[in-house]
């Protein structure tokens, strides 16, 4: 789907959709719990649907209605047959579920599309293979995992995706003995691990932090839970930046006491308004990079984004696509080994950009359009369905002028 956006400032109230990060975690924990859990305020998307279908494949019963889900925890796992899980393009689903399936002893075949087959899982092939798991894996998808995961010591580098740590934190409490996750270097993306630990606690699972990582007691029991998913600061970031560029949007459904790392967007915007620039370590907030680059493009001085090298293996090479987004519209962005250098120009203009299938590039482009003088065309705008299917509906309700010009995909 290709769209045309005519520049206009946004104004009004938007109810920020539920956190995708928290929804993934609550759905998985509910599926592992004894009894019935009810989770409200879910923002359904392709990624969330992938996790729901994954847990169904492992034996959970999940019933969805509008923004709610009723989950009956896994009672009988399909151990006598191979389960097939389609992760679509969701890296969270893939990396969260691999350890869970192996902890349950379910032989599982994983499928995926887009760039997901190229996203690495070598941490698991190395560490899980030491603990009873066999991988039939040739650096692509589909692939199969089999065996029964055993407790023990898991050594994980801190500069890899926190999704690997989260996956282990889900799985290890199910095992018969205690386990240790030993971080062999500084843990990046720590806020995402904090979200995991916070959600696990709601379901009765206790994770003990140690000097070197985490101690996980075995034979713990997930308890059923009823609650709502809080709003997503990573999605809110687009509207916060739109405000910084001159819009007047009131944001609802956000928890000011949230442990979400992307809440840092507020602090960075304040710094930019005070100083005219920012220098952002994005090791803990990688999802903010595209919209931060948009913010920096309209600053007064050069801004830098660093410690973001993992963005090269997202839905797109997000460092490249972010730079292309801004440079194609008159900006000045240079790619470094681990981030971006953004120099403001007075030459920002309309034009045409490609989404490269990346939902965050589409939304960053839509925010950028509010500060341009000419129309912006976004090719492949349907990518927003990955995380925020109603983004353009909300955008229009706020006064955005968006028209579909082609349904090509």
Give the label of every model feature segment.
Residues 1-409:
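Short, structured segments at the rim of ligand-binding sites
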């Amino acid at each position: 789907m290709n769209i045309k956006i005519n520049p206009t400032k946004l104004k009004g109230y938007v109810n920020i959709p539920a956190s995708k990060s928290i929804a993934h975690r609550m759905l998985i924990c509910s599926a592992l719990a004894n009894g019935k859990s009810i989770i409200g305020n879910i923002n359904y998307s392709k990624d969330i649907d992938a996790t729901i279908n994954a847990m169904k494949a492992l034996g959970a019963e999940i019933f969805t209605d509008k923004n709610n889900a009723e989950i009956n925890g896994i009672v009988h796992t399909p151990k006598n047959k191979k389960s097939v899980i389609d992760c679509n393009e969701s890296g969270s689903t893939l990396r969260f579920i691999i350890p869970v399936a192996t902890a349950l002893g379910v032989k599982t075949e994983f499928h995926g599309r887009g760039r997901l087959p190229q996203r690495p899982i070598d941490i698991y092939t190395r560490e899980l293979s030491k603990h009873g798991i066999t991988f039939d894996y040739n650096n692509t998808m589909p692939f199969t995992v089999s065996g029964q995961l055993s407790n023990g010591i898991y050594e994980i580098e801190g500069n890899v995706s926190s999704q690997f740590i989260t996956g282990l934190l889900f799985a290890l409490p199910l095992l018969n003995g205690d386990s240790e996750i030993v971080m062999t270097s500084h843990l990046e993306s720590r806020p995402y691990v904090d979200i995991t630990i916070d959600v696990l606690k709601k379901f009765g699972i206790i994770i003990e932090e140690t000097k070197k990582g985490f101690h996980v007691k075995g034979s713990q029991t997930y308890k059923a839970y009823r609650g709502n998913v809080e709003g997503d600061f990573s999605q809110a970031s687009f509207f916060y930046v739109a405000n910084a560029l001159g819009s007047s949007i009131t944001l609802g459904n956000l928890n000011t006491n949230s442990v979400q790392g992307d809440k840092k967007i507020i602090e960075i915007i304040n710094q930019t308004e005070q100083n005219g620039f920012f220098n952002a370590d994005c090791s803990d907030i990688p999802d903010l990079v595209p919209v931060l680059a948009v913010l920096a493009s309209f600053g007064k001085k050069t801004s830098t984004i660093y410690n973001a090298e993992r963005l090269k293996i997202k839905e797109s090479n997000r460092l490249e696509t972010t730079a292309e987004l801004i440079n194609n519209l008159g900006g000045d962005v240079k790619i470094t080994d681990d981030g971006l250098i953004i120099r403001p120009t007075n030459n920002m203009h309309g034009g045409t950009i490609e989404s490269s299938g990346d939902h965050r590039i589409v939304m960053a482009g839509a925010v950028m359009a509010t500060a341009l003088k000419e129309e912006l065309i976004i090719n492949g705008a349907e990518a927003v369905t990955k995380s925020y299917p109603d983004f353009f509906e909300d955008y229009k309700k706020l006064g955005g002028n968006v028209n579909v010009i082609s349904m090509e995909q």
